Every structure is written in C-alpha cells, then in structure tokens.
Amino acid sequence: MKLKGFLAVGVSVFGFSGLLMACSVVSQFDQVDDGKIKLASSLTSKRAAEALETVVKKYNDTKDPGDYPIEIVQIAGGYDGGKKDVQTKVSTKDKNNFYNLILNYPEIVSTLSRSKMALNFDGVNVDKLHPNFLSFNSRIGGIRDDGIYAIPISMSTDLMVINGPVLHYILNSARKEGTPTSTTVQATVSSRSAEKKGTLEIANDSETTKLWQNIQTTAQNNSNETTKEQKQVKRSSSSSSTTSTTGETKDTTKSDNKIKEFWGEYQEVDGGLKNFTFKASIFENWNETLDFATRIANSFPEKVKNITNKTGLDLQGVLGVDSSSNALYAAVFAAGQANYDNFFFNIDKRTGYADYSNFLNKDSSYQNLESVYNDFYKLIQANGLFVNRGGSYSSNFEKFHQLAFSVSSSGGYSYYFAKDNAKRLKFSNYAIEYPSFTQTIQAPNSSETESNLLGTFKLSEKDINLYKGSIPSGKQQGVDAILISNPNLINILEQAKQKNTAQGSESTTNKIIGYTTTANVNVDNQNIFSVSKLNNEQFQRKIIVNATEETLDQSQTLQSNESIVLPMPGKYKSTDKNKVMITQGPNLIGIHANEKENIETKKFVNWFLNQSITDWNSNNQQKNSDQTTKTAAEYFTDQASYILPLKEKFNKSSDLELKGSSSSSNLTTSSASASLLISNNSSTASSPAPKKTNNNSNTFTAKALELFQQAANNEIIPFSDPSDFRNGTFRNNISSSFNAAVNSKVSFNQFVQNFINSLGSGFRR
C-alpha cells in the first residue's frame, strides 16, 4: 500500500487522440469482485500521501470483519494521467484492473457517465458538507440521474501573494516627497530612505492607508536583523500593524537597498508610475492589477522591460501567474457577470453535455477573452508577466525577490517562504532553494579501491554508495548501494571523482560533488537526475550536480512575515457587479464495479465523511499534534493544507481560527489552539503574514477560509469548471496557448486562432 510521488503534468497528455477515445461510448460492465475496494490516487504531496495512507490503515484496522479492505492504487502522470487511465479502462472494459474510487476532477464523472460507469453516492450522508460546494454536480455533463457523484474533499482557491519588501521599494522609490503616510508609521519609520524623485501619490482612503502601513511593516521586518526574536502577534480585524520586540529597528533603508540590488533604479517615465495614484482597490480587479504591473515594468526598464532573454537568476517580471487557465477563466467569468451562460461553455440541459458555441461563435465569452487578453498583452509586451510552465512556480522566484506579486494556489504556503539565512543551490543560469530531505554526496578519496565507486552519501548514519557498471558483492541495490545508469550523470561524477583523487592521498576530507534528495524538484537531466530509490523510500530519489551552495542573508529572501496575502482579483473591472473566486481541487469520485463492491465503496465513503476518531496520532504522525476528534476527511484535509467545505466551518456567526501542528514545515489547518484570529473582512488591506513560529501559522489557508466562508454566505460567487469529457482538453489548451503567447508576444487574433486550431473539430459537436 506504499505510495509513489509523481509530478502532476500541466499539459494535456491525451490531446485530440484522447478526445476521440473519449467519444467512443461503450456500454456498462461489471468489474470482477476481488474482495477489496481500490482507491486510485495521483497525489504528489508527501504529507497528503502519508495522510491518505494513514486514513486507509485506520479504516482497515477498525472496519467490521466482513467489510472489504481498502487498497491504494497509485497512478502515474498526475491528475491528467488518472484521466487518461480511466478513459483507457472504460474503453477496453477492463474488468480486472479497474478501481472503485479515484481522487481526481469532476470531468472524469462525465467520462464515466457516458458508459453508465459513474457511481451515484446515494445513501452516503453528505449533510456535513455545505450545499454551495456540492452544487457543481448539477454542472457535470452526461449525468442521467440527479445525485452526488463527486465529493470535494481537498479544496483550495487562488490567492494574491505580495512580496512586501519589493513593493515597498517600488512605491517608496516612485512616490512624491511628502506623500502622506499613516501617523503611526510616520512616527516610527526612519526618514533615511533614498531621496524621493517620483510623482506617485498614495491615496488617503482607509483601506489604502492600512495596506501602505502593512507594506512598510514588511519592509521593516526585512531590514530587521533580530527577526528570529520577533514575537508572533494575534491579529483581528482591528489590528493595523505588527508589534515587535525591544531593539527591533524601524528603518526600511536596509530592505530598500537590498531590493535595489535586484530591481535596479526607478525611472520616471510616461506609461510608468509617473503621476500615478496607488490605491488598495487596485488588487480587487484584473484590469487595474494588470495596468499597475505594466506601469511597474515600464518604470524599471534595466531589470524588467528591456530584459527579453531571462535566465533563472534574473528578475522574472512583476506579476507571476501559476495557473494561466485559472486567471483567464476567473477574469472572463467575472466579465460575464458571473453567469455560466456567458462563459466559454456550459452544460446543455437538452443534450447533457457541454456546449462551446458561446466561445466558438464569438459571443460574449469570446469578446470578454479579447478584453482580458489585451490587458495581459500590455504586461507581456513590457516583459512583466511570468507564467508557470511545467512546475516552475512563482514561489520559486518570489521568495528570492524576483517577482513583486503573484497569483497562486492557497495550498502552496510551505513553498513560498525561505528560512532565515536560507541556503540555495546555484547553477549557471538558475537557482533552487536547498531542498528538504537532502544529503551531500562525497567523492571517494584516494584510499578507496573500488574503481567503479562514484560517490557516497550518508543516510541515518548509514553509508550509501553510488556505483557505475555493477554493484560489487557485499553491497545490495536499494539497501546500501544505488546503481547509476545515466551516462551524463556518470561522466559528471567521474570528473569530480578524478579531480578529488588528484588532490593526493593526504586529503582527509572528501569533497562534496553533489547532493541527493527525495524532495519534489524538477528533473532536467543536465543538473538534476532521477535515480533508483532505496527500498524503504516512497518518493523518487534525485541527484543534483553542477551546483554551488550559498547561504543568503535574510534580507535577500522573503519570509512569511514579509508577505501580504490577498484574494485573487475577484472582478475583471471595478464596475463588475459580482466578485468571484476559483474553487478547485480533486474530488472523491465513485466508479461502478458490481453490486457488492458498490455497497462496500459507499460504506467506506460514509465512514470517511462521518465517523469521528480521536487517536489519529497513533499512526506515525507528529507526536506533538493535537488529539482532537475528527473524521477521516477532516484529518486528510488538515494534513494536506486543504479545505473541507463543512457547514460548521462556514457558520457566519462563528470566528474562523487559524491553527497548525507543531512539528512540520508543511503547515496545516487543524484543531489545535488558535495562533491567529482571522477577520471576516476580506478587504484588500490584509495584514502581513505573521512570522513563522512553532505554531506554524498558515496564512494562505486562513485567507482561503475567509473566502470560502463568503461563498457559503453568498457574498462571493465560487467558480468551478462545468464538467464535460472535453473540458480538460479545453483548459489545458487555452493555458498552453496563452503561455506560448507570453513568449511570442502575439496579438489576440493570433493567440485565439492558435488556441482554436489546437482544439480540433470535436468541440463543435
């Protein structure tokens, strides 16, 4: 029942050929009753995978003797790999190797329903879940009978994450001398900042005043050399600035000077921040956010606008967007007044499947996409937009001050911030933060006689040797040895080994020639290589070479108390009537098997959602975690830093509390004592994220909870894709077409033509 880690792919793995496969409808079939319930998973998070394993073990240990056990089936290729696997098993009527449940997105239900293989969770008690987050089941194509076919158990949304010190330097450089600031901050911030030469003004409304005050606070934190001693402060809707320990400097000069090394000199130019008025409301809609980002790019030509061929060590732009499709979908949906009839596609009640005619016939969604794209296009032309391509997330760069702000998943908190005096591995044209679960590889010294020994690393006080060719007798693959087969990696390690040997036999310290890790780093087969796992490892082992290790000063990196976390822009333009939010995440989806297994599947799902258990920590989890009674669903989402849409969590009259466990850097929302009080006010002037402490406050989850609460109370409209067997291809192709346009800088007409061509004729049916 061990899980492997697989990197979720961001581009459709099946494309048009998979679309044709999906169009081939087969009749319902029964699976062979093998006496177990198989749960298919493509989880990539180590904590989520371990939590799921714990849940399954708990069920198997406590179920009634006659109940079927649960078995986890790992699917390669991420969520797209899971979609492809379901299509294959349905089309081939795989009766022996199919599964009963899968963690994936609702479009799989549409694929299953075409062959009557979707399992209706009738009889499962979903009363604990808020109906606003179950209603998407009515927007799944192909469903013949109303019901619950997909259950959201790991929800997230997208957030705006501002690098406070970077934005402070930008605004402080551009603002007019004597621009009003809040009385509190003006009294405490040193006036030794660089001489003002700009004409930017900061609006004096209350929301902007609070936001500017928080931006200044983050710059103070970045200047502060005593950050490790800073006390965490509980915050409420009335709090306006952080409290610091005695001796903490209130000067922002050090921070500004450090950021200036990255961003260069501010230039007062037309089309930039010249004569601009900064307002908090800028971040509430895409139109103004993109205009602001474009003005910043134009104001820093030496480091942003004029840099066309960026390396990973350069500024990546002003705004980072981790999911292009989410950004486009949210903006177009908001521009269409949050009405699914004005979106790219919606489920046609007559046919039961998605109708793409609104877009393909150039109706409202096409026109809104043109407006949205043209706003992005100005930023693209100024080289100010960074988009995620295949796992290169904004967090990788914003934490090193290479972006000013970004839109990213609320599940990404643990990736966004560097530790004090963080280390990173620097290559010739990019760098990565020093990964967790990493060991150094030493070259053999001249006294070691094995000619095919490439290097050694130590794991739990045990030496693990790396060999080429073959493993000598007395050593065992996966136990104390790993055989290296990649010729490029062998060559790099060989050269380092020979260089070390040339130092002479008197050398007593083995040279570090590389690093090895089981963390989730991108394999490129140039600097980072995938190798065999050790026998007891769940996740793929990698070897990192050609890297220089460097330790960074705190002011060179983003800490959690230097960020400002806001909602993703909820409108396209400020005049839009409704605010929207993205709701996303894999669902628990049932698959028809046979009468007995269907009953056993629903029995497990009902237990998962409703059975309260106290002793979760007895199963290889944190010793210091709380013992609060919770269901398996609550435990899973808490451990994975996601949100379970429980009615009680979204009770309008109750306070939302941010909580966390105490012994992991992958932070969670759990039932421990509160470490931060979250305001019900989702205004732009959000407080900076507090300094990470032993309570590990997860401000991303806190902000997401605020938004989900508003959606539950109909104060904001949650968007989720109408689900059809084709919508995954549509989403992936609009994302890849947009990302390509960021490079090529093509006009809207060329972008949209490339996108439509990529869809093929199957979308006009």
From Swiss-Prot:
Cellular compartment(s): Cell membrane
Lipidation (N-palmitoyl cysteine): C23
Major localization listed first in the record, in broad terms: membrane
Membrane topology, record value: Lipid-anchor
Keyword Membrane part of the UniProt annotation: yes
Lipid attachment site numbers (S-diacylglycerol cysteine): C23
Entry's Gene Ontology cellular component terms: plasma membrane
Family annotation (PROSITE patterns): PROKAR_LIPOPROTEIN
Top-level division of the source organism's lineage: Bacteria
Biased composition regions of type Polar residues, renumbered to the chain: 179-192
Ranges for region Disordered: 177-203, 218-255
Family: Belongs to the MG185/MG260 family.
Name of the protein: Uncharacterized lipoprotein MG260
